[in-house]
Structures are given as structure tokens and as C-alpha cells.
Amino acid sequence: MTRDIMGKKALLAVVAVLTLFAGAATTSAAAATAEENYRFYCAQCHGLEGRGDGPNATENQPVSPRDHTSAKEMEKLTDEDIINSITDGGTATSKSSLMPPFGKTLSRSEISELKGLLRKLCKCKGK
């Protein structure tokens, strides 16, 4: 009987440790930085530096991806415009339908952090 109880306690301890590690992995994966999210979701079109020259930006597209480093263009946008574009895609702000919506992919916090990164890239505040 004692051996059976010790075996159950050992199994319970292993499950508890594995659960802790699984929770830590999930938390760190969900807490991607704005830079990581930009590289993963945005750089394909906007480029790693944000200049609109990513590998998916081709001359065949009806519009070019926005150059996020252009203060002249980016300062025309409010923070709300940027958040809406990221959340609902390009059509939400009467821009390219090629810009997909990320509102169901990224959290509000991640979208807000991306907006902050875009403001850093353009070195501007917006209107």
C-alpha cells in the first residue's frame, strides 16, 4: 500500500513539473515582442527595416506596401488609423486589400506595441 501511494505521489510530481514547463512555454510564446511580430507578420511585405521592400513586395501589386520609415507619410496617420489597419486590414482604412487583418491573430496589446514600433521606425508622432 505504501509503495502504491509513493508511486502516485511521484507520478503527480512529474505531472506538476511538466505542467509548469508547458505553461512557461505557452507564456513565452504568447509574449512575442513587437519586433518579433513585425518580422513574422509584416516584414514579408514591408521589409525587415520597414521600407516597403519585403520579398512579397513586387511590381505586379496594384499598390506598394507602405514605407514605415517615411515620416512624411506616417505622420499623416493617427495612432487609431494604424491600429485599425493592423486590426482590420488595409480595406479598413481604404488602403490595399492585400494587407490582411491581424485582429484575430494578435492581442490588443501586441497591436498597440506594433503601433509603437511603427512610430519608432518613422520617428514621428502622427496627427
Predicted regions and their residues:
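Electrostatic cytochrome c docking/interface patches
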Residues: 22-37
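Axial heme c-ligation environment in periplasmic c-type cytochrome domains
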Residues: 64-66, 81, 85-112
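Residue-level signal for the nucleotide or nucleotide-sugar donor/cofactor binding architecture
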Residues: 77
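Periplasmic/extracellular electron-transfer cofactor-ligation site
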Residues: 35-62, 88-97, 121-127
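N-terminal secretory signal peptides that target proteins for export/translocation
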Residues: 1-8
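Bacterial N-terminal signal peptides
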Residues: 13-23
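Short microdomains enriched in Cys/His and/or Lys/Arg
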Residues: 64-74
